[in-house]
Amino acid sequence: FGEDEAQLLTQRTLKVLRHRFVGAPPTVEQVQDVVEQMLVDANHTKTFRAYATYRDQRHRLRQDKRTLVDVASSVEEYVDRADWRVQANANQGYSLGGLILNVSGKVTANYWLSHVYPPEIGQAHRDADYHIHDLDMLCGYCAGWSLRQLLYEGFNGVPGKPEADPPRHFSTALGQMVNFLGTLQNEWAGAQAFSSFDTYLAPFVRNDGLSYDDVKQHMQEFIYNLNVPSRWGTQTPFTNLTFDWVCPEDLREQVPVIGGVEMPFTYGELQKEMDMLNRAYIEVMTAGDRRGRVFTFPIPTYNITADFPWESENAERLFAMTAKYGLPYFQNFLNSDLSPNMVRSMCCRLQLDLRELLKRGNGLFGSAEQTGSIGVVTINCARLGYLFKGDEKGLFARLDHLADMAKDSLEIKRKVVQRLMDDGLFPYTRRYLGKLRNH
């Protein structure tokens, strides 16, 4: 058709748009819907088909642009500190490592949203209906590891990498723990945790015949080394330790093994050594570094049980540290049907009831300490409350839908991470974990 017909159709389109969209401008898709309607009403079938094809091509181009990362702006926004992500993580400073992580993170996040998740799941994140955490990492969220396994087997088993036998001394055990946590942190987005820190290390203190000053010196080295920003992005490894304080019942009669040799004592006979370890840890954390700055990691969790020694000197030190820095988490087992061996605290977002995992078999030490989280999704409840004010039924219907999508996103992530693990992308995780059945 000619120019006059085009002008007429344009005027009709503008009239419809002004009538339909009062007070808010229409979207690109809404404008194109009206254009198609005008072409159909005017019996311009050939033009309608051509326009529909053009529209589809432009839609695909817009989607592709959303996936592409502008290289120049990505680098310059970080260097100029114009990107909000520069200040998004208190554990990451402005640095070359931070720049590398920031740029690669944008690529990885777009890969998740546009090429892994279904369109509806990715769009819900982009529209802020919920937030899928750690999209900048192509891996799982957090993991709790078996300290007993590391001490019994040593840090080894990955082809082409240095291998170490099981540690025979306290200092060696701490050194392997630092290497283990730092290395595994590179294969996970979030926290790395060990449970029963004081229980499992007490045999090394007894066997080496260490004095308290010796223990404290080694503890200083251990804590300092865990706070060095050696993680990708020039970050400090996010580490957690759980302290039993008193030997758990399920370990009291068990005999420790050091370097393949059974010791002439049980875990339950080592309360003195456990007290030394707890005192050393608390005093080093309370003192901080050479400038008195608090050590951020490892974050301690203390199990509060019926036999917790409230009036002891160590308890005084513990609560003085808590008052000064607010460092520890406390796991309260008083008046609870749970016992310390039934719960593992992984990080600030995750606590696991191991009774649920034990239903899947393998026994306590086959599953309990090798647990964690695939990922975290936060639903935008504030928006739901605003949108569905006075409509409780509608609110819960929408919440159910978002929760289902969040669940689906995590199940998809589980399959992706497991496949990548099987293919060797996470060699140390495959060596010490193997499967994500308890995550």
Across the structure, where does each feature detected by a protein language model lie?
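Charged, amphipathic alpha-helical regulatory modules used
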Residues: 1-74, 78
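Conserved catalytic cores of very large enzyme subunits
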Residues: 57-439
